[in-house]
Design a protein with these regions (language model features):
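The feature captures the conserved acid-bearing segment of alpha/beta-hydrolase catalytic domains
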Residues: 1-48
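C-terminal catalytic histidine-bearing segment of alpha/beta-hydrolase fold enzymes
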Residues: 40-141
Length: 141
């Protein structure tokens, strides 16, 4: 997706309030940016929900996982994620802008961290998310 163009289809983001792997705040900010630009983007945060809350039988567990949560990147990728003719890129957390591959390649490792991630099924949130997604899909037909 080119973050600077109109989206080809509506998006509905299903976010867990306590997701410590894919943090909800950057997703919410991105959705709000898209919506402010006139795109049909919405989200819902499910209270108490962790990462993978929508799985049926995920028992509570902590995993030591790698992620890139130390940055929040907005990257213009004209032809997809593997196209390195992108630019510019902007880290919303630091305010730093990148205009070439060398700068980008030197910075990205600073975004990486390993942290403990909580996962657990949440039946109530999952059931509501399914209803919300079905309503969203029905609304775009």
């Amino acid at each position: 997706v080119d973050h600077h163009s109109k989206l080809p289809a509506p998006i509905f983001m299903v976010l867990g309030e306590k997701d410590d792997m894919t943090l909800p705040k950057p997703c919410m900010e991105l959705a709000e940016e898209y919506a402010a630009a006139g795109n049909p983007v919405s989200y819902k945060v499910y209270q108490g929900a962790t990462h993978v809350f929508d799985r049926l039988t995920m028992l509570w567990k902590k995993h030591n996982e790698g992620n890139f949560n130390l940055c929040s990147m907005d990257v213009r990728m004209p032809y997809g994620a593997n196209d390195r003719s992108w630019g510019p890129a902007h880290d919303k957390y630091s305010g730093k802008t990148f205009t070439d591959n060398a700068e980008w390649n030197a910075y990205v490792p600073k975004c990486r961290q390993t942290s403990w991630v909580t996962v657990e099924s949440n039946e109530k949130a999952r059931e509501q998310a399914v209803k919300d997604v079905l309503a969203f899909l029905k609304g775009i037909q």
